[in-house]
Amino acid sequence: MAELTPMMQQYFEIKNKNKDYLLFYRLGDFYELFFDDAKLVSRELDLTLTGRDCGQEERAPMCGVPYHSAEGYIAKLVHKGYKIAICEQLEDPKQAKGLVKRDIIRRVTPGTVVDASMLDESRNNFLACVYATHEDMGICFADISTGIVYATDTEDWTDIFNELARFAPKEILAGGFAISFDEFRRFISERLEDALVEPMEDECFESEAAAERIRQYFHIEDFKENGLNMMHFAVHALGGLLDYLEKTQPASLAGLNDLRLYRQGQYMELDLNARRNLELCETMRTKEKKGTLLWVLDQTHTAMGSRMIRQWIEKPLYNPLHITRRQQAVSALCDDVINRSALTDVLRQVFDMERLIGRIVYGTANCRDLRALAAAISCLPEIRSYLAAFDQSLLKELTENIDLLQDVQELIEQAIVEDPPILLRDGGLIRSGYHEEIDHLRSLASGGKGEIAAIEQRERERTGIPKLKIGYNRVFGYYIEVSRANSEAVPENYVRKQTLANGGDYCDYYITGNRER
């Protein structure tokens, strides 16, 4: 390591902490990959493989992609089942003293994608976790882009296989006996060939730590309230899932707000062969949606609705009371053409609120996402009004549970301009008049010279020093220059910085404040 250049030493320090990830290492306007990562990515994405001096006799293999278009390349790699670690520059290279500080700002794996460009809006993107002993198993599924989590336990591996077939996760965490169980591994390789499998240590599933994580992130004090006290292996699986997210996607944990526990008997059990033969969501031959039951029934007008009807088809209701209640709701909507049509028109205007909120929680949203959320929220009063016209128990329940979120809508509309830039660094996204300090900083940025001249004139009048000047250098920032002949007139609130041959430089607190801004 000692013979490597400082930059390569930094690269290996970061890479050694992320050995299972392809490391996108920011260098100027590019994300670069080195050594084996570079060879693999150049082959997978058909990129030119070059080299870079690294302090050793042989040049380091290297390939790269422009940072502004990196998401497209990352999406292709994630789709192929690779895990990505994005290493960003943490300071301006022009201002850095020595080597630029860098660190991992984001990790992307097939089961933890939140970027809209990498997701199919019509289906959930699940991360699964399976924990098993020889007799018992627990399994859970999380879509961190929407915040929904399902969990159950069982004593039968057939149930585990059926659930994996139903949810079709992109990534599977495995612990305990599941890691070495040949039939489990064979099922995944044959039936879920696109899924990435991550073996995990037993300590990640330890019961007390798992229970504490569940209490912390799902805000559950008493497991008896939702039945978790009777689902011990579901607790193990949830603990392993949360442990993985803590280590790789800590920001995602704030968005997991919808834990749904279920038992096998709540839904009709369909094994993989039945699902395939019935062509519920994909055809046997082409694996496409067209020609399936979902293709016929999915006449939804929102991405959220499209995902929901897929879930309904994948998980047919089993309880006759629940089936009848849903049928009555559908019948009520069909019978009232006027209100149904009006409701449909409003729903067409609703953006994907689940994933918008997810991106906001994880810090990957842009300003237009905020405006899109406000626009979607603005539709809620009309939606609730039209639903209230239906005299049916399920629709009434939906109506009562709609939170209009007016405070959130008002905050966004008051703070963000109507047509904001996509990138934060472009500026101009906060409305004038919303925040006094931001308005002042904006004034300094756009008309700073005029304000400095005004301050200079004010200080001349206040001190009686006619030749007082305001200057600037990189060491002190803005400063006030006063000649030696006028040193007696310098006020007490000026702080001496250095003495010149013909006078002194002083800096008062107002000027210092502007420099810091």
Question: For the regions a protein language model found, what residue spans apply to each?
Answer:
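Divalent-cation-assisted or electrostatically stabilized phosphate/pyrophosphate-binding catalytic cores
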Residues: 61, 493-500
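Amphipathic alpha-helical "coupling" segments that flank catalytic cores
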Residues: 334-337
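A short beta-turn/loop motif at secondary-structure boundaries
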Residues: 347, 462, 501-503
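Cytosolic, long alpha-helical scaffolding segments
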Residues: 384, 408, 415-416, 478-493
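Flexible, glycine/threonine-enriched loop-and-boundary segments that flank and lead into catalytic domains
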Residues: 450-470
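Short terminal or interdomain "cap/linker" segment that borders an active site or interface and mediates
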Residues: 492, 501-517
